[in-house]
Regions:
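C-terminal capping/lid region of NAD(P)-dependent oxidoreductase domains
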Residues: 2-3, 216, 232, 268-269, ...
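Glycine-rich beta-strand-centered segment in the early N-terminal region that forms part
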Residues: 24-38, 50-99, 137-139
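NAD(P)H dinucleotide-binding glycine-rich loop of Rossmann-like/cofactor-binding domains
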Residues: 92-172, 314
Length: 350
């Protein structure tokens, strides 16, 4: 085995430099993986604006790859073998101790004894534990494998937030997570899905994912559409999928939710914001936060996401508008930022 690999690292200015780095560190129970595909997430974009020094380890968490080496031990429970193609859950399960209070019921994201971070998917190799590796069926290729992660985020949010069949569902934003939320909501039986979209390519994709009503992002457009679709009541379940360095989407989602409905806070607003907590109190709105994935109702969200993608009923891979090689990853980040390029999801071929 070689001692070095190619990896892309933010130099601290938001520019990615591809260079030789040491192979990822092994740890107790770690599996060596050859990365094949990695998606550029909105959080990857936002982090380029927040860093003031270069990365020590590669990032990238929307990842699919191939098992190169398994550590000694019994892996029958996982059904894994060298050469298997897997979607890699690297945030929780891939580092989880599997023994603590949270791991005992499959909430690996909240593990109290996570293994050290050894680097993400913007590199040729990764190390993660077997609990975070999910085999891909033959019908899914590497492109599909690297969109399992964002689909699992929405699966987790809708399950954890307790969306019900026949709900009127609103989705604020039609970027990657908004689009997976639209698709998952329809798959889980939503009666009507209303979505907002900022860019033409997002609006088109929202319709392909199953949105019944797609509106722009002008003041009141989304809220009005949710009211009209629900006979003036408001949506039963609203997903805030935007987050980032703004808070308008959070306020929109609350306003569009009916009394005693649920607002799923999925996007992650990264700035301080003012919010009147009296409104959800008086209206008895449940604001439910959700992040990442875990085991719910006996199945991991990655497993459900893989089944949805393998069903052939959801054209989610069509959100992948651009692909670049690892050596040209900066071109991928540039395209992801520039929505005039038609970009939705940019993936890196590793």
């Amino acid at each position: 085995m070689v001692d070095t690999m190619r990896a892309a690292l933010d130099d601290g200015t938001g520019q990615y430099v591809v260079r030789d780095v040491p192979m990822p560190t092994e740890f107790n129970g770690s599996v060596l993986l050859r990365v094949r595909q990695a998606g550029i997430c909105g959080s990857d974009l936002h982090m380029t604006k927040l860093r003031n020094e270069g990365e020590a380890l590669p990032s990238g968490h929307e990842v699919a790859g191939e098992i190169v080496e398994l550590p000694s031990g019994d892996y029958d429970d996982y059904g894994l073998n060298v050469g298997d193609r897997v979607a890699i859950e690297g945030i929780g399960g891939g580092r989880a101790c599997t023994k603590c209070r949270f791991c005992q019921y499959g909430q690996w994201k909240h593990c109290m004894d996570l293994a050290p971070e050894t680097g993400g998917g913007f590199a040729q190799y990764m190390t993660r534990r077997a609990a975070g590796l999910f085999k891909l069926p033959d019908s899914l290729d590497w492109v599909d494998g690297a969109i399992v992660e964002p689909m699992a985020v929405s699966v987790h949010g809708l399950h954890y937030g307790r969306m019900h069949p026949d709900d009127v569902v609103g989705v604020v934003g039609s970027a990657t997570i908004g689009l997976s939320s639209i698709a998952a909501a329809k798959a889980f039986g939503a009666r009507i899905v209303i979505a907002s979209a900022r860019y033409p390519q997002q609006a088109e994709a929202a319709r392909k994912m199953g949105a019944d009503i797609v509106v722009g992002t002008g003041p009141g457009e989304f809220e009005d559409a949710c009211m009209q679709a629900s006979s003036g009541v408001g949506a039963d379940f609203v997903v805030e999928s935007v987050g980032g360095h703004q808070s308008d989407s959070f306020h929109q989602a609350v306003r569009a939710t009916r009394n005693q409905g649920t607002m799923l806070y999925l996007g992650g607003v990264k700035i301080p914001m003012k919010f009147d907590l009296f409104e959800p109190l008086i209206r008895e709105i449940r604001i439910q936060s959700a992040i990442c994935y875990g085991v719910l109702d006996g199945r991991h969200d990655y497993e459900v996401a893989i089944d949805l993608l393998a069903s052939g009923d959801i054209p989610y891979r069509e959100i992948v508008t651009h692909q670049v090689d690892l050596e040209n990853i900066q071109d991928g980040f540039d395209a992801a930022w520039d929505k005039s390029s038609g970009s939705i999801k940019v993936q890196v071929n590793v």
